[in-house]
């Protein structure tokens, strides 16, 4: 992924004497620029003569007083922590003591013969291969060196031809003087040596200059600068000065001087403190942009292929997760089915069914025994009540002529007794209809017992109410659950 552009808000305040490197607009191009440019002083950001920060120059800042009455200045204030003197913005060590100059590294440039021989191969391979930014810079330097060497060769050949045209007899005399020397040296070795006359340079018919093809012959010049004494006017007109190689300080290297004198620098460049390597970084940035433009289509195709691969990987992961989910659902359903099957098998077990039926039978037997005892008690009470009624009737036979026998009526049953009868707990709620019938018989027996008790108490109440019966009016009737009222009769 490409790193985002570091364009943010202003990090340093406007009235601060320091400017952070991210606030510098020239650093928007490359990240290497950002690292190389240090934190700078920002004193005069306004128009000329109108500073936003200080109305005086930087040299007068040390002369300012602390304020107040005392105009003296301490020695510690000069080297205070906020003072820009304490900040070492650039490494100003002498270049002769730097490790890169003490340990001389061999130049990565190839030899001239290799450049001339492999010129065609490098051009064909450079077009096919994907150039890196460093390789592009090296190729540019190599190409510029080739062009300049070819231009120098052409200029030197032109100068030699002009010189030959000016003084041909001197060159011919030199050749004729060299021939007897060669002849004398060869006489000792080869006795049968035939002298060959020197061919003239100019033909009498054509009056033209012939090219002497002596590759091993070296022409000795009279002076050291005889061939290379070229003026500015003699330089080729199509020479592009922008493509000339430059050294580390930005000076142009012309010819072979730059390669032989790499360790010599000017006085200004060695002592300057405001050196900013932004120009070199700009050149590197331009070369990187060229490489990026050349490789833009390939980068786009690679990004598209990578995105397609990522999309396919995500689709595969989604399908795998779906399969896992289906497997989990299937396992859960199978587990539930197995649990239900085991429960049904347990419920259908004959031993459990036999135990349940035996418990139901025992419960029914206990209920029947309880009902039998209740019926026995009711019968006992009925026999006792019949004997009491017989004795009471024998006592009242003598007074039967005087007192008319009142009609017996059923006594009222209280509400509490009815609730008790209704709210009797059924021990076997889920039993069969036979158990319900037996419980109904039990309740009937209890009600009959209560009625018998009421009949036993009735004669005594009848004897006590004879006086009221003999009076004019009397209420007659019986009430059990629903009150029944008899009409009033006058006697």
UniProtKB/Swiss-Prot annotation:
GO terms for cellular component: cellular bud; cellular bud neck; cellular bud tip; cortical endoplasmic reticulum; incipient cellular bud site; mitochondrial outer membrane; mitochondrion. The modification Phosphoserine is found at residues 16, 37. It comes from the Eukaryota. InterPro entries: MMR1. Phosphorylated by the cyclin-CDK PCL7-PHO85. The keyword Lipid metabolism does not apply. Present with 1070 molecules/cell in log phase SD medium. Involved in the guiding of mitochondrial tubules to the bud tip during cell division. This is Mitochondrial MYO2 receptor-related protein 1. It comes from Saccharomyces cerevisiae (strain ATCC 204508 / S288c) (Baker's yeast).
